[in-house]
Amino acid sequence: MPQIVILPHADHCPEGAVFEAKPGETILDAALRNGIEIEHACEKSCACTTCHVIVREGLDSMEPSDELEDDMLDKAWGLEPDSRLSCQAVVADEDLVVEIPKYTINQVSEGH
């Protein structure tokens, strides 16, 4: 099974994390199953950007984002070329290195 490496994040996993993912599951589902509480305000329906992550390694192994995900990502805080919504990004057969951005759009709008 592929592994996901979550880079250290002060709030979500200060030490970082490494866990196995099931091919075909989303990055978000794998993270939640392993105790990493990535925010997902829209309950995984691709209607917000709170689960935005940056795939630092392994992006090429995944299916590309669709038009709806791209439209939502345009609203994300800290958008980068390798950004994905973790609720839509399906794990393939290669390991991934994932960074959770410092803020979500909710935190920015609330002044954190």
Swiss-Prot record:
Q: Write down the superkingdom of origin.
A: Bacteria
Cofactor comment: Binds 1 [2Fe-2S] cluster.
Cofactors named for this entry:
[2Fe-2S] cluster
Biological process (GO), any one: electron transport chain
Write down the Gene3D superfamilies for this protein, in alphabetical order: 3.10.20.30
Record-annotated 2Fe-2S ferredoxin-type domain positions: 1-104
Report the InterPro entries cross-referenced here. Answer: 2Fe-2S_ferredoxin-like_sf (IPR036010), 2Fe-2S_ferredoxin-type (IPR001041), Adrenodoxin-like (IPR001055), Adrenodoxin_Fe-S_BS (IPR018298), Beta-grasp_dom_sf (IPR012675), Fdx_isc (IPR011536)
The record's keywords, sorted A to Z, are: 2Fe-2S, Electron transport, Iron, Iron-sulfur, Metal-binding, Transport
Residues annotated to bind [2Fe-2S] cluster = C42, C48, C51, C87
Q: Which GO terms describe its molecular function?
A: 2 iron, 2 sulfur cluster binding; electron transfer activity; metal ion binding
Per the record, its GO cellular-component terms are: cytosol
Chain's role:
Ferredoxin are iron-sulfur proteins that transfer electrons in a wide variety of metabolic reactions.
Q: Which family does it belong to?
A: Belongs to the adrenodoxin/putidaredoxin family.
Protein name per Swiss-Prot or TrEMBL: 2Fe-2S ferredoxin
Natural source organism: Pseudomonas aeruginosa (strain ATCC 15692 / DSM 22644 / CIP 104116 / JCM 14847 / LMG 12228 / 1C / PRS 101 / PAO1)
